[in-house]
């Protein structure tokens, strides 16, 4: 199994976040659903490990979401 990286996780979550926002869910629900999807794909312990080891997680996550679907981030 390939090691999950922060960039891989956030790109996957970012794509799903945008899809959930397009469906009309608010930011919080979209985020929770996206991380739930990531846990299903990569395994909850792998997702947790990447999050725990990451620094500047919030900045990186917001930057990726802003690039993927800025209309839902920048208001």
Across the structure, where does each feature detected by a protein language model lie?
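Compact alpha-helical subdomains of small soluble proteins
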Residues: 29-75
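Short N-proximal segments of mature Sec-exported proteins
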Residues: 2-49
């Amino acid at each position: 199994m390939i090691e999950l990286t922060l960039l891989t996780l956030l790109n996957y979550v970012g794509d799903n976040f945008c899809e959930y926002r397009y469906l009309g869910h608010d930011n919080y629900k979209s985020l929770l659903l996206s991380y739930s999807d990531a846990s299903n794909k990569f395994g909850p312990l792998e997702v947790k490990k990447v999050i725990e080891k990451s620094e500047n997680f919030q900045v990186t996550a917001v930057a990726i979401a802003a690039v993927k679907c800025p209309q839902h981030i920048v208001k």
